[in-house]
Amino acid sequence: MNTQKQEAERMKEIYQSSVKEVLGQMGSREEGLTIKEVEKSREKCGWNELAEGKKKSVLEIFLEQYKDFLVIILIASAIISGILGDAESAAVIVIVITMNAILGTVQTVKAEQSLQSLKKLSGPEAKVLRNGTVTPIPARELVVGDVILLEAGDYVPADGRLIENASLKIDESALTGESLAVEKSLDEIEEEVPLGDRNNMLFSGSFVTYGRGRAVVTSVGMQTEVGKIAGLLKSTSEKQTPLQVNLEEFGKKLSVLILVFCGILFGISVFRGENIGSAFMFAVALAVAAIPEALSSIVTIVLSFGTQKMAKEHAIIRKLQAVEGLGSVSVICSDKTGTLTQNKMTVEDYYIEGRRIRADEIDMADPAQRFLLDCSILCNDSTNENGVEIGDPTETALINLGSRYGVEAAEVRESYPREDEIPFDSDRKMMSTLHRIDGENRMIVKGAVDRLLDLTDQIWTENGIREITKEDKEKIQSQNQEFSMEGLRVLAFTFREIPEEHLLTAEDEDHLVFLGMIAMMDPPREESKAAVEECIKAGIRPVMITGDHKITAAAIAKRIGILKDLSEACEGAEIENMSDEELRGFVPKISVYARVSPEHKIRIVRAWQERGNIVSMTGDGVNDAPALKQADIGVAMGVTGTEVAKDAAAMVLTDDNFATIVKAVENGRNLYRNIKYAIQFLLSGNFGAILAVLYASIAGLPVPFAPVHLLFINLLTDSLPAIALGVEPHTSDVMNEKPRPADESILTKDFLSKIGLEGLVIGVMTMISFLTGYHQDGALLGSTYAFGTLCLARLFHGYNCKSDHPVIFTKRFFNNKWMQGAFALGAILITAVLTIPGLHQVFKVETLNFEQLGTVYLYAFACFPIIQLLKWVRGKLSE
């Protein structure tokens, strides 16, 4: 903590210090370091690279699959089965849990690569001044004190303080979330400001869009801002999804219930005078049979099917459990730039001749409007050739406006070639170019509204050019203020006539004619508003977290429905000194956070989590990565997103569409519901088997099932319908429900009562069938009847578990081809076992004739209408 504090104080001194002072602090000079000084600096500060994180091997990932409590119980069951001589059961259990581990490993084998991706951002090469000579070197060889040279198109290879500036503009959006390129300055900054406002500093991983400059390196490797994010990624642990927590709790509760049942059975057997050893072996065998061995594998398979469905809908799942976790999300914390917005500056409005005109309503036949468009293209250094945009995003937006109206920049520039220019700089806050237009030399001046109004004498109106009045200037200032309050970036355009063969000087930037203003912004994605509305309908709180300015963020948030009132917006500085407890009470009041750092993002996400919420964080920049990892479900943008963000996320959107997240939430809710249906199916069937065995034991009857019967049920008549239930067709009605509580258990009282009631029906019908066969021809026929009835009853029961409501006589009964297939295959197999003479010894059954087979089918089918009737009664009672 002290080291971080010292580092913060040092950075504060750097951006608040003059160029001369910083060079002194870094032990450097304008002509750079000597080789000896480089070696000395490297000994002190190390290489310009990020520390490696320890990667998990495939074997470690594979072994982690065995940490699940239910899997541990199954392993213990396999060992006990082996000791008791039941090799078949032991082998099946081992095969099932091994298959589950392989499936889980295949899905998660892409280990975290965040630090590797961060290393790529450091850039492969840097131009450095050493001994007064410019030398290209690998970026990792840079040291504190090196003087680096930068120009448009370069990535910044390390953090540094600017010492020479020629109109330098840097795109820092990946690091700060700021959508506009930042104009850099040499001036020291007096007050303490956040990262995005340190305009005399350069940061590793950012990109030069315009101009050139020199900087002295102030931090390398893990001490850079990117390095600090790498440190946050290392210290941020992944959270378990609600399903992981639920299944662990479920496994523990289920084990206790089964042990209680088996204990009761053991006590009854001993009380009846049976051998203690035999009674114990039977109780253990029953426990092994009662545990749904296939559950872990079925959940994994269902989630894998879910990932395939979501991939077709533009959402790639990197971490399997995230599929279900999405269904629990109650808060979505979204980055603004590139997530809710298009990450592309776009012209929104014109202001000309005293009127505001929407960008899509410009009249190219109007001389003033066309001249303003031409001026915006001519006084502009950006290009757009064959769809490749080069230059400052603000200037590119002006070129793209022309393209929308069929006005190509190359043609305009060819018609009115540039004869002279005064480049933009942050002191003048303007740029001037000279062109021959309609036989006259015209200087076009583009810049900040306030600055140009001070230099303006005349104004273009619909009645011609006249002297500008105080009222004109007030009206322009008022419109500029209105644009700013809407989060728009505004440029003013002016012009004047220049004498023939005159070279431009700064003195010429006076006595100008005010032409108009062009307002632009990074606009919301078209689908963002509808997606936000869907979130709110589904009980999900959308929150915007961005490094951009508060006014800009609030304007976007208001457009798409996240923000209702400006009081719901705040800046990172406001939460800087809050304790964690204060922040927990503060977050429900705020919908927009602006000018936040990566540390702020993590704290905001954590505060929501500590309030009991499941939080999804979306983003695309390096600055989002730690919060993506802290969130329960991190979501990265696949097209505009950095590799760092993608590697830290649980889900990547291939269409960068915020609406895809809402669809993913719907899929997650449906998958959780389907998994519950599968669990209901497995447990109610197993409970029916336990009740049948328990009744036989109490009544002093022979055991109704042989071990091979239980194996057959577990492998076929359990697994196939359970998987089919897992892929039950999705419905949109789940989005009308509120998110389920994060701590809601799968085994609720209501859920257990359903399992108990349905298991009782299956158990009773199985024992009636057993007694029918037993009284007809003894224990073997009784066992055959019980085995056949239990298998078929569970196949029919698959249809009961398709919904919480009766499905008979509804379209839902036939809407799952996988269920039809599972039922048909299961019925064919059990019919074959019961009727083919050659199989009776293998499966310990008596071969049945068609009349006997019909009896078994009748008892099995009887379970279906009874349970459907019970569902109808429960529904009526709940109303």
Indicate where each model-derived feature is located.
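Helix-coil boundary and interhelical linker segments in multi-pass alpha-helical membrane proteins
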Residues: S697-A706, F770-G782
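Alpha-helix capping/termination and helix-coil
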Residues: N380, G612, V665, R669, ...
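Conserved cytosolic headpiece of P-type ATPases
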Residues: M1-N736, I746-L747, L760, F787, ...
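Generic alpha-helical transmembrane segments
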Residues: T717, I762, T784-G798
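Membrane-water interface at loop-to-transmembrane-helix junctions
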Residues: P741-L760, L780-Y785
